[in-house]
Structure formats: structure tokens, C-alpha cells
Design a protein with these regions (language model features):
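Conserved P-loop NTPase mechanochemical-coupling segment
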Residues: 10-19, 111-170, 198-207
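Alpha-helical scaffold elements adjacent to nucleotide-binding pockets in ATP/GTP-utilizing enzyme cores
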Residues: 34, 52, 56-64, 118-130, ...
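P-loop NTPase motor core
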Residues: 11, 16, 27, 66-136
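Loop/turn-to-beta-strand initiation segments
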Residues: 42, 102, 185-189
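Conserved helicase/translocase P-loop NTPase motor core
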Residues: 165-187
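Walker A/P-loop-proximal flanking segment of P-loop NTPase domains
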Residues: 2-90
Length: 208
């Protein structure tokens, strides 16, 4: 009799990859329910040492909660990912939460420059890349003309990397949340990973 030994997902932090490629995975999916139903907090800060799986956990949240933007009624990928996981036994919770929310997921791990100028440009690039996920907003009938102009600025790298437009960058996540809420008529979930990296680098290199 032979047994199949699953590979360890060393260095892998993408939930979909781990599940689809059949890597070894400790099922912590019921944590989704404890966070999004059993905990009434509007804001949750997850603090754990490095390499404790925070990024994978947040990626798992995104995979479970996020709408299919091409077809919001299509849950086929969600079902494929979670059908053999513990959370899928929670039928009422899955019906209410799985694939039901617009999700903004952003990581600041690459905003780690040696000076403010470069860090600011990294941040502008990060915001521009994020806007690429939501290009459907450009044609949304729910957004006003001014909303669409504001979104276009969030999709313009040169504009974002110009320090004269600092307020646009500062308010970018607030704008994304507003636009997605208007488009879908649903609360937006914001996931922020590695939020401390820019702060640590700014402190280390004295441009905080």
C-alpha cells in the first residue's frame, strides 16, 4: 500500500495556490467565522511573530469573502476551494458571507525605501496597481462623473508619484471603499498586511 506525501508550502502565502496544487494545509478556515460573525469588532488587528501565517490567513479571508467581480452570482471557485474545509460545514454562515463582499487587500511589504522620495513613489505604484483590480469602476453606472475622474487619478502612476498630489494618495483607500460601496451596494472589507514596514524603514533611515 502506498501513501501520498503532501508537499510543505514553504514560502507560499497564496491560499488558492496551496489548495489547488494540493500542498499540506492545516485547516484553520473556521477562524473566518470567529472573526466575521462571532466577533463584533469593526476593526481587528492581528499581531503574531513573523512566519506565523498572518499573510496566508488574510489571503484565505480574501479568497472566501471576495465577490467574483466578473459575475457576482458565480460561487464556483469559492466552492471548489472550500468544499472540503471545515468552514464549508457552516452552511448558514457560508450562504451569508462566502463570495458576498468587495474586498480590498493591500500589503505594504515592498514600501521599504531608504528615503522619503523613493518610499512615496513606491506607495504611488502600490495604489496604482491596486486600482488595476477595479477597472470595472471606470464604466460603473453607479459612480458619478466626478467619482470616475477621481478613480482615473488613482489609476495614473505619474499623477500619484507627484508629491503635489499627496492628499490623493493619503485618501486613496477611503476613495476605493466609497467607489466599491456605491457600485455593489455592499459593505467593503479592507485587509492590510505588513502595515508596519514603511514605518519601520522610515524610522530606521530617519525620514519618519
Amino acid at each position: 500500500m502506498s501513501s501520498h506525501i503532501l508537499q510543505l508550502p514553504t514560502g507560499k502565502q497564496d491560499f488558492k495556490t496551496i489548495v489547488k496544487d494540493n500542498y499540506y494545509f492545516v485547516d484553520k478556515t473556521k477562524y473566518i467565522k470567529s472573526v466575521f460573525q462571532d466577533d463584533s469588532s469593526q476593526v481587528l488587528l492581528i499581531t503574531r511573530p513573523r512566519r506565523f501565517g498572518k499573510t496566508l490567513t488574510m489571503n484565505m479571508f480574501e479568497s472566501f469573502l471576495s465577490l467574483n467581480y466578473d459575475d457576482p452570482n458565480d460561487l464556483s471557485e469559492h466552492i471548489e476551494l472550500f468544499k472540503d474545509k471545515e468552514i464549508y460545514k457552516e452552511k448558514e454562515f457560508c450562504e451569508k458571507f462566502m463570495g458576498k463582499y468587495p474586498v480590498i487587500s493591500i500589503t505594504f511589504k515592498d514600501v521599504k525605501a531608504l528615503n522619503f522620495k523613493d518610499a512615496y513613489e513606491d506607495l504611488g505604484e502600490l495604489i496604482c496597481d491596486l486600482s488595476d483590480k477595479f477597472l470595472f469602476l471606470k464604466d460603473s453606472p453607479k459612480l458619478t462623473f466626478n467619482d470616475k475622474k477621481a478613480f482615473a487619478k488613482l489609476n495614473d502612476l505619474d499623477y500619484l508619484q507627484n508629491k503635489r498630489h499627496l492628499n490623493t494618495v493619503k485618501n486613496s483607500l477611503k476613495k476605493f471603499i466609497s467607489f466599491l460601496y456605491k457600485h455593489f451596494g455592499q459593505k467593503v472589507i479592507l485587509l492590510i498586511d505588513e502595515y508596519d514596514v514603511p514605518l519601520a524603514k522610515a524610522s530606521q533611515f530617519n525620514y519618519y
